Amino acid sequence: MPETKKKLPKAYGMRDEQDVLSAVRDNGNGISFVRLVFPDILGRPMEFTIPGSELAAAFKDGKGFDGSSVAGFVRIEESDLVIKPDPKSFRLLPWEYRGFDEGIRWREAVMFGDILKPDGGIYEGDSRAALKRNLLRARKEFGFDDFKCGPELEFFIFPSSREPVPADQGGYFFSGRHGEVRKEVQLLLHRMGIATEYDHHEAAPGQHEIDLRYESALEMADIGMLFRYMVKKVCRMHGLYATFMPKPINGQNGSGMHVHQSLWKGGRNLFFEKNGPYHLSLLARRYMAGVMTHAREISGVLSPWVNSYKRLIEGYEAPVYVAWGQKNRSAYIRVPEYQPGKERATRIELRAADPACNIYLALAVMLAVGSEGIRKKYDLVDPVEENIYHMSGTRQKRFDIRVLPRNLEEAVRVMEKSEVVREALGDHVFHTLIANKRREVEEYGRSVSGEFDKQVSDYEIQRYLPIL
């Protein structure tokens, strides 16, 4: 008789708690453990694992953990927190684990969750909750039902985490030997229900990019966390090291996270208007005006590391000036040109964020300042289609072009005065993040005798390369 092909377990797309429990309880699936994942205030993944048999209890009452051990959470005297898994975030990890005993094999799933206080209230230090709160507010106020985002995350591949030596000497669209690493990452993502659009070698030696297909903001933030994990894991399996550090190599382009975004209602893209300027609706233009008006204030969230500002300098295809255009890749925001029949693709592309940011907080502040532009009916300035790096100061003033913060110290100082950012993040996250970044600036200052410059320092390599 022909061998019966084993049915693969359902890997994603769960509707509710019962759907998840059915998948986990199915003995044929071999799902023995579930990883519960959440971000700390810096956007790094925190996790602990529970047996699949404990998942029903976790859905009912949550699972307690010590929050005092997590950056930006609570003090030791008030450390008890609870994570409640989000069933829609369930994804089966696309491999099987094996023990030393060949008879021991198991599979694991991953789930993101909401952080709660012991009394069941929402914990105000939860980055995921901050994004959900901003989504809910904008939906209630403006009536849209989806904030779609599609990030392009760039990263470097090095032989090890000890020093930033590129694993190849390729350039833009170079077809080098690490293309198969990108393909393997994509195939594993596809098995988890995560869609990609394309991959390619980026401009700098050892630099790569895989573009994710747009999704609703909360799901995309979860996907962003999984993406970074998957890239690092696949590279590790190949004896390589992947980093999302914004600027690991002096004299080369840094890594960005360009975020394509649009608002939707009832399956219709609210950013599109057939007869609007650049085919943008009034809502889209006001949204974009809000993002640009508050660009300096959100810089500390989108580019949250000392090293982030070594990327945001002239001459390396990174935005330094707050302006927008269609073909201008030196601008802060780019509006891709409209293609007839592609109304769904109408969007704006914000180019300033870096791939090591807290994605939840980054999307939260983007939506918040865009909403502020809609709420207060901001006017959009004229587009700039020339290279801003080469424009005179007089010409920059004519287009009302402002400069992004030049370093993290300036970014924190500007953010601290921003009421719209404080409201978007909530008091706890806002003040904790500012305090954390001040300590980072002080530590950097001590290591380089108080000087901020454009060169990547040894301190940054030692501090960021192993962790980002």
Name what the model sees in each region:
Residues 2-468:
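Glycine-rich, acidic/polar active-site loops that bind/position phosphate-bearing ligands
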